[in-house]
Amino acid sequence: MEVEKPVYDFEGIEFCQTHPVFDGARWRMVRNHTAVLNKDPLILVDIPNANVHQRWMNGVGKCGLAIANGLPVQQELYSLFVRESAGKTCKDSFLLYIMKNTSRMIQSKNLAPRTTPVSISARVSYYAAFGILPDRQIAIEEHYKNFHLLRLDVTPISHAQVGTVRAGHSIPSFEH
C-alpha cells in the first residue's frame, strides 16, 4: 500500500487524477491540469478525413465544456476545440465511439456544454490545486483564444499518424 504525504490545503487532495476546486459556487473535482493537456488532444481513433477530424474536435470540446465550464484554463482549451470544429457537430454515436471507456463520457452525461465566467474564487482555488498563478491562467486563456489547431486536408489519416496541433508546434502547458 502506498502512503502519500499529508496535505494541509483542501485543494491539495488528489483522487483519481483530480483535485477539488471551488468554482465560486460549489466544490468540483477537476481533472489534473497536466492530464488534460497531455491526454485530451490525443486522438485514439482513426480519422479518415478533415470532416471527421472536425467532428472529433467538436466532441472533445463539448464533453470538456460540459465538465469544465467556469474553470480556469480548461474552459478555454475546450472552447478552442469547439471553435476549431468549424461548426461540424459530433453525433451521439460518434461521441460514444471516441469517448469509449473514458470517465469523461460518464462525467459529461446529461450536462450541457456551455461557458460561464471564471470567478476570482475559481482562479485562486485552481492555483491552490495546480500551482498556476491567476495571472498565468489568464495568459494561457488568451493564448488559447488566439491559437489555431491543425486542420487536416489529407486523407486518409490514422491515429498512428495524428497530431492535433500545427506541425512543429504543441499546445503549451505553461507549467510552473
Question: Each PLM stretch: what is its role?
Answer:
Residues 1-9:
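A generic structural motif
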Residues 8-176:
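Active-site and adjacent loop segments of nucleotide-processing enzymes
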